[in-house]
């Protein structure tokens, strides 16, 4: 799970490559803008690591629907939780999520995102991209961004890296923890 999370965090910081004349959907533009802003923050040598972390946290919180993700991750346990427990859990989940990438912001090493297109999947839009790093350590990874667009408010719901859903992996990890600790 940590390897997948590390890949996710690096992928959040990638600079997209636009195809000249491409007719990007609103969701494709969202992914491109998110990656552009992330790389601008992470490549800024004029600010401290703490400032980078604060700016990146603000960007992530504005782009990812952590409320919805946290509910999905908790699964059945969410339904039986009290309102107070739900509120405390969402707050703790956000802190956990943010802290999981805070020390990994320096891992960006020039990867680029190529937006391949998008498709509808029920109420979601899947933006298909490839992560490319060229040079001595060539890398190509397929990444699918699951987005929810509610009246123009687009949020990242999940990332699927080479067929592995990060949200489902997170859910399995949390469910295992709950099962092993009397839930």
Task: Name each region found by the language model.
Residues 99-141:
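Surface-exposed, charged secondary-structure patches
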Residues 7-16:
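Bacterial N-terminal signal peptides
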């Amino acid at each position: 799970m940590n390897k997948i999370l590390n890949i996710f965090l690096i992928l959040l910081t990638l600079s997209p490559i636009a195809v000249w004349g491409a007719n990007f959907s609103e969701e494709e533009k969202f992914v491109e803008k998110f990656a552009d802003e992330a790389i601008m923050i992470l490549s800024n040598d004029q600010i401290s690591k703490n400032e980078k972390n604060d700016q990146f946290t603000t960007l992530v919180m504005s782009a990812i629907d952590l409320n919805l993700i946290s509910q999905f991750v908790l699964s059945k346990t969410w339904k039986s939780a009290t309102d107070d427990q739900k509120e405390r859990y969402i707050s703790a989940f956000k802190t956990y999520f943010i802290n999981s990438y805070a020390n990994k912001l320096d891992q960006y090493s020039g990867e680029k995102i190529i937006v391949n297109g998008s498709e509808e999947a029920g109420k979601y839009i899947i933006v298909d991209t490839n992560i490319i790093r060229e040079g001595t350590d060539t890398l190509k990874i397929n990444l699918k961004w699951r987005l929810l667009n509610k009246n123009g408010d687009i949020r990242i719901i999940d990332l699927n890296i080479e067929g592995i859903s990060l949200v489902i992996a997170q859910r399995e990890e949390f469910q295992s923890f709950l099962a092993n600790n009397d839930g």
